[in-house]
From Swiss-Prot:
Designated name of the protein: UDP-2,3-diacylglucosamine hydrolase
EC id: 3.6.1.54
Binding site for substrate: 78-79, 121, 159, 163, 166, 194
Keyword terms of this UniProt record: Cell inner membrane, Cell membrane, Hydrolase, Lipid A biosynthesis, Lipid biosynthesis, Lipid metabolism, Manganese, Membrane, Metal-binding
Top EC class for this record: hydrolase
Cofactor note: Binds 2 Mn(2+) ions per subunit in a binuclear metal center.
């Protein structure tokens, strides 16, 4: 069994999500061969050198799961793209590129965070290209922690304000880009997060039936996609552990 989650946006202000995630790690995730976290795991990440006690606690919980035998794979999101090797060593997880092609249930599957698919959001795409540029990343990682904290708050506040103002189709994925990327990587199944719109979308890629599975965000409830002999099945669950 493989589990995939995304968009937990972990932060100290949401202890309900943290409790549910720690419960998830100690129970359901222990039964999995692998756990994939496809971005926006944390609400904000200013660098491994700025880890808080809360973030160390999360890393420790992941390490316990990893030590129990479950492989953990982590992908950057738009909120936590500064997660680096130090955190991954502490947490016992492997950092994946975006996109990442993997075999699941005997078929090639493409994993993405999903923000790079929102090509109609021109302003965000320009910002993303700048932020993910290796030179920009080097500059960001070497800024004083206080400066990074201010910048993170500014970017987060602007993102929230702009998202409220933009039309829903602009902040969702662009269908043509989905087809292009799936064709480029020669897959019939794409799994991503980012949009907070859990669903399974049927489409056609190069004349063949295909599907796009959108992971749910953890807010009013949690979400996990389970891949096993019965297929790809996603379901919500209550945040308060029973």
């Amino acid at each position: 069994m493989i589990l995939l989650i995304s968009d937990l946006h972990l932060e100290e202000k949401r202890p309900d999500i943290t409790r549910a995630f720690l419960h998830f790690l100690a129970t359901r995730a222990r039964q999995a061969e692998a756990l994939y976290i496809l971005g926006d795991f944390f609400e904000v990440w200013i660098g491994d050198d700025g880890m808080t006690p809360f973030q160390h606690e999360i890393a420790g919980a992941l390490r316990e799961l990893s030590d129990s035998g479950t492989r953990i794979y982590l992908m950057h999101g738009n909120r936590d793209f500064l997660i680096g090797k130090r955190f991954c060593r502490e947490a016992g997880c492997t950092l994946l590129g975006d996109p990442h092609r993997v075999q699941m249930n005997g078929e090639p599957v493409l994993l993405m965070h999903g923000d790079s698919l929102c090509t109609l959001d021109v302003g965000y795409m320009k910002l993303r290209r700048w932020l993910r540029n290796p030179l920009s990343l080097l500059i960001l990682r070497n800024l004083p922690l206080a400066t990074r904290q201010k910048l993170a708050r500014k970017l987060r506040n602007e993102s929230r304000a702009q998202t409220r103002m933009k039309a829903s189709e602009i902040v969702d994925v662009t269908p043509e880009e989905v087809v292009r990327v799936m064709g480029e990587y020669d897959v019939r199944t794409l799994i991503h997060g980012h949009t907070h719109r859990p669903a399974v979308h049927e489409l056609e890629v190069n004349g063949q039936p295909a599907r796009r599975i959108v992971l749910g965000d953890w807010d009013r409830q949690g979400w996990a996609l389970q891949v096993d002999g019965e297929g790809f099945n996603q379901a919500p669950f209550e945040l308060t552990p029973a």
